[in-house]
């Protein structure tokens, strides 16, 4: 028998022994590990996405604490039934910028649910998707909201069945870009609405940092939105096919 044949037989025997050893030692250990994992693994707590962060009796803590009002929204089953018109729903979940304002109650006061609903109707907002209020493009509701308004308390929605008992420290207004119109035009729709809501509710307008919204901040936001609109109008760079 040649040396090559003996070498092949030796390799085959070693391979068989190795496979048998792996199977013998790994099978019981794997089974025990699976049983142990199954017994020790604690039940997972089901977590729902949220529309806004929980707030205390102080004014809101800024844009990072109010979930882009869009990215952590709590879905209300009644607001998402198949086949129903969902007024205020964005055509797409994509967004790249959010402008946030608040109307907060004055010290030692709260905003009453009934008053909020009346003020929202007076300023042209409608109750819709996610059980919050929206300003829509007149005649084109399918284009989605220009901006929306929610409670700063979880889950952010307005429970109309118990609206008379509702008392909250503030409401949030959020403009999510891209909007169904230019960013600057959308801002010019939102700002007077927020100011009017504050007037009707005897509240104060705050920016995303909990500061009173002043002229300087308003001018800065307008500049930001002009720059955003210019950026959106820049055509993409496409290489010439000849090159």
UniProtKB/Swiss-Prot annotation:
Record's protein name: Cell division protein ZipA
Source species: Xylella fastidiosa (strain 9a5c)
Keywords of the record: Cell cycle, Cell division, Cell inner membrane, Cell membrane, Membrane, Transmembrane, Transmembrane helix
Cell compartment(s), UniProt: Cell inner membrane
Lineage top rank: taxon: Bacteria
PANTHER family documented for this protein: CELL DIVISION PROTEIN ZIPA (PTHR38685:SF1)
Membrane-side (Periplasmic) residue stretches: 1-4
SMART domains the record matches: ZipA_C
Record gene name: zipA
Record topological domains on the Cytoplasmic side: 26-243
Oligomer and partners: Interacts with FtsZ via their C-terminal domains.
Function: Essential cell division protein that stabilizes the FtsZ protofilaments by cross-linking them and that serves as a cytoplasmic membrane anchor for the Z ring. Also required for the recruitment to the septal ring of downstream cell division proteins.
Transmembrane segments: 5-25
Biological process annotations from GO: division septum assembly; FtsZ-dependent cytokinesis
Tagged with keyword Membrane: yes
Primary localization: membrane
Annotated family: Belongs to the ZipA family.
Cell inner membrane in keyword set: yes
Classification via Pfam families: ZipA_C
Biased composition (Basic and acidic residues): 38-49
GO CC list: cell division site; plasma membrane
Taxonomic lineage: Bacteria, Pseudomonadati, Pseudomonadota, Gammaproteobacteria, Lysobacterales
Membrane topology: Single-pass type I membrane protein
Renumbered residue ranges of the record's region Disordered: 32-89
């Amino acid at each position: 028998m040649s040396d090559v044949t003996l070498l092949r037989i030796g390799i085959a025997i070693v391979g068989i022994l190795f496979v048998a050893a792996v199977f013998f030692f790994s099978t019981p250990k794997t089974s025990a590990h699976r049983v142990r994992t199954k017994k020790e693994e604690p039940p997972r707590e089901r977590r729902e996405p949220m529309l806004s962060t929980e707030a205390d009796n102080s004014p809101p803590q800024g844009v990072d604490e109010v979930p882009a009002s869009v990215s952590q929204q709590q879905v209300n089953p009644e607001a998402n039934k198949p086949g129903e018109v969902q007024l205020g729903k964005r055509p797409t979940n994509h967004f790249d910028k959010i402008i946030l304002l608040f109307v907060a109650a004055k010290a030692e006061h709260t905003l009453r649910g009934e008053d909020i609903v009346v003020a929202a109707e007076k300023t042209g907002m409608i109750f819709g998707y996610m059980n919050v209020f929206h300003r829509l493009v007149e005649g084109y509701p399918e284009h989605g909201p220009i901006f929306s308004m929610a409670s700063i308390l979880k889950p952010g929605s307005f429970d109309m069945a118990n609206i008379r008992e509702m008392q909250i420290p503030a409401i949030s207004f959020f403009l999510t870009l891209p909007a169904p119109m230019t960013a600057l035009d959308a801002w010019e729709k939102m700002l007077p609405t927020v100011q009017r809501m504050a007037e009707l509710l005897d509240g104060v307008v705050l920016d995303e940092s909990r500061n009173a919204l002043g002229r300087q901040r308003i001018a800065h936001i307008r500049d930001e939105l002009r720059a955003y609109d210019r950026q959106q109008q820049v055509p993409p760079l496409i290489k010439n096919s000849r090159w």
